Structure formats: structure tokens, C-alpha cells
A protein has these predicted regions:
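N-terminal twin-arginine translocation
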Residues: 1-10
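Cell-envelope/glycan interface and biosynthesis
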Residues: 8, 14-127
Length: 127
């Protein structure tokens, strides 16, 4: 990923704020410092983005946070990410699949590679 390589080369420090819409928790985390991922920050994000139905976290793909940070920077938003869905345990995913055809059987949410969010000050079409 070119953006990740640029971050290391530039020595970026990246901080994001997550507001989970189901748990109502808000967390501000520095996940990258001097172009390197910060383990403590990633652990906090893993917990903040856990399956809220089971309180089960997973190791989220840290590149997901790079993409989210880039989106926020590109659109110029200063609002927290309002997270609707992040990690889903296989059991939660199965339950949601029974309720909706829109839930993928092999959802990236189960792998820690997806996060559904919106930025309150940015039209979704712009994201």
C-alpha cells in the first residue's frame, strides 16, 4: 500500500476518534507515531471496535485505520468516526444473515477488515 509506505517515509503521527453508535463509547487513539504502528493504540481500537453483542474483540487490520484516517483528512472532517459496525463474531454474523440478505456469509467484518462508519459533517456520497 503506497499510503502506508508514505506514512513510514514521512514519519506521520496518526490519531483518530471513534464513537461507537451501539455502545456509546468514544475513544481517541494515536495508532501510528513516527510512521510506525503503536501497539497500545491498536489494542485500544481493537477493544473499541469489538463485537458489541458479545464483547469479543479481534485484532483489526491496522491498514483499515490508515484508510479511515486518509478519508477523514481528504474530506476535511474534524468529527469523530461514528461507527455503526466493525468486528462481528461468526455467531453474530450468522444471526444477522438470518435477518438480512445484505450480510455476506464471509463478511470482512469477521476478519477485522471492515468498519461501517459515517462522519456527521460529511455527506456519505463524498466518502
Amino acid at each position: 500500500m503506497r499510503g502506508t509506505q508514505d506514512a513510514i517515509a514521512n514519519g506521520d503521527t496518526r490519531t483518530i476518534t471513534i464513537r461507537h453508535m451501539h455502545t456509546k463509547e468514544e475513544t481517541t487513539v494515536t495508532f501510528k507515531r513516527d510512521g510506525r504502528y503503536v501497539s497500545e493504540g491498536l489494542e485500544k481500537l481493537n477493544w473499541a471496535l469489538r463485537d458489541w453483542r458479545t464483547d469479543e474483540p479481534i485484532r483489526m487490520d491496522p491498514r483499515l485505520f490508515d484508510v479511515a484516517w486518509e478519508v477523514q483528512r481528504t474530506v476535511g472532517s474534524e468529527q469523530p468516526f461514528h461507527v455503526v459496525s466493525a468486528y462481528r463474531s461468526p455467531g453474530t454474523n450468522s444471526m444477522l444473515r438470518r435477518r438480512s440478505r445484505a450480510v455476506a456469509k464471509h463478511s470482512q467484518h469477521m476478519l477485522g477488515k471492515a468498519m461501517d462508519f459515517y462522519l456527521p459533517d460529511t455527506p456519505t456520497a463524498r466518502i
